[in-house]
Regions:
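N-terminal beta-strand motif that seeds the catalytic metal site of vicinal oxygen chelate
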Residues: 1-19, 69-71, 124-131
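Short loop segments at secondary-structure junctions
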Residues: 15, 47-49, 57, 75-78, ...
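Vicinal oxygen chelate
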Residues: 15-18, 71-116
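Amphipathic alpha-helical segments
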Residues: 18-31
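Short secondary-structure junctions
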Residues: 29-34, 95
């Protein structure tokens, strides 16, 4: 049998593991697949999307991640996902959420930052875009 790549799991540094797990679970409705605080690690899953959370990150690691790395999550029916999570995003601090909008390159997206400022972009091809 030939080897196959079956997924990729970004490892996101977080300052407080419990806070981050709660955010991904309660705001984005990810399922907690692994919660190992003694190992400063958790994994959250929703459909095919997986994110590893690495707890105990220092300020330098958080700043480097926040300023240089983002996760792009491909979505089917962006509007349905937005309707699902928007009520839970209403209480987030200003600047943490950008509602759905159309990029000039033919993709619709919304943006969301986790408690440590890690940027997640949720997007799908705009069906109204001319080929």
């Amino acid at each position: 049998m030939d080897a196959r790549l079956v997924g990729i799991v970004p490892l996101v540094p977080v300052s407080d593991l419990a806070t981050s797990v709660a955010f991904y679970r309660d705001t984005l409705r990810f399922r907690v697949a692994i919660d190992a605080p003694d190992h400063r690690y958790a994994m959250v899953i929703r459909e095919q999307a997986r994110i590893g959370l690495q707890g105990g990150a220092d300020a330098a690691a958080l700043a480097a991640t926040r300023d240089n790395i983002a996760a792009y999550v491909l979505v089917e029916d962006l509007d349905a996902l937005w309707r699902e999570i928007a009520p839970r995003c209403a209480s987030l601090p200003p600047g943490r959420v950008r509602p759905p909008f159309r990029q000039d390159y033919g993709v619709r997206e919304f943006h969301l930052k986790d408690p440590d400022g890690f940027l997640m972009l949720f997007g799908e091809a705009d069906e109204n875009e001319e080929p």
